[in-house]
């Protein structure tokens, strides 16, 4: 009959955080080794693609690694991918340009109205 293996921690249930791997020791015994959950890649907040240059760790482990493992040297580094940052910059620039054009057109209309009022009075 096969040797039985028991959990080594207090939780007796087969949950996602209590997974085990059965391993044979050099002495021939079967023992349970608790397996850590697999880490997932950090994703871009806009498009959801995996971020390059950032370590793949469990959330708690990010506190124990240096800042260079968690970010890249760019605006929104470690939060957004390069393509989304580029899009944001272009969008912000175009919005500012639109505001300037709107302001210039409004000033021109005001000048035309004032000129029309002056010619109407004479």
Swiss-Prot record:
Entry-linked Pfam families: Ribosomal_L34e
GO MF annotations in UniProt: structural constituent of ribosome
Record flagged with keyword Methyltransferase = no
What organism does the UniProt record list as the source? Candida albicans (strain SC5314 / ATCC MYA-2876) (Yeast)
Q: What protein is this chain from?
A: Large ribosomal subunit protein eL34
Does Protease appear among the keywords? no
Return the GO cellular component terms, semicolon-separated: cytosolic large ribosomal subunit
Any single biological process term in GO: ribosome biogenesis
Q: Which domain of life is it from?
A: Eukaryota
Instruction: Give the encoding gene's name.
Output: RPL34B
**Quaternary organization:** Component of the large ribosomal subunit. Mature ribosomes consist of a small (40S) and a large (60S) subunit. The 40S subunit contains about 32 different proteins and 1 molecule of RNA (18S). The 60S subunit contains 45 different proteins and 3 molecules of RNA (25S, 5.8S and 5S).
Instruction: Give the UniProt family note.
Output: Belongs to the eukaryotic ribosomal protein eL34 family.
Q: Which InterPro entries match?
A: Ribosomal_eL34, Ribosomal_eL34_C_sf, Ribosomal_eL34_CS
What the protein does comes down to:
Component of the ribosome, a large ribonucleoprotein complex responsible for the synthesis of proteins in the cell. The small ribosomal subunit (SSU) binds messenger RNAs (mRNAs) and translates the encoded message by selecting cognate aminoacyl-transfer RNA (tRNA) molecules. The large subunit (LSU) contains the ribosomal catalytic site termed the peptidyl transferase center (PTC), which catalyzes the formation of peptide bonds, thereby polymerizing the amino acids delivered by tRNAs into a polypeptide chain.
**Primary location:** cytoplasm
Compartments where located: Cytoplasm
Keywords (alphabetical) are: Cytoplasm, Ribonucleoprotein, Ribosomal protein
Show the PANTHER family listed in the entry.
60S RIBOSOMAL PROTEIN L34 (PTHR10759)
């Amino acid at each position: 009959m096969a040797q039985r293996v028991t959990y080594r921690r207090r939780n007796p249930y087969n949950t996602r955080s209590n997974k085990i791997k059965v391993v044979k020791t050099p002495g021939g015994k079967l023992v349970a080794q608790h397996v850590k959950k697999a880490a997932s890649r950090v994703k871009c907040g806009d498009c959801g693609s995996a971020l390059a240059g950032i370590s793949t760790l469990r959330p708690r482990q990010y506190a124990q690694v240096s800042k260079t493992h968690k970010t890249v040297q760019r605006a929104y580094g470690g939060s957004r991918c390069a393509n989304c940052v580029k899009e944001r910059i272009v969008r912000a620039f175009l919005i500012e340009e639109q505001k300037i054009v709107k302001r210039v057109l409004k000033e021109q209309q005001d000048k035309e109205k004032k000129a029309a009022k002056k010619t109407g009075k004479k």
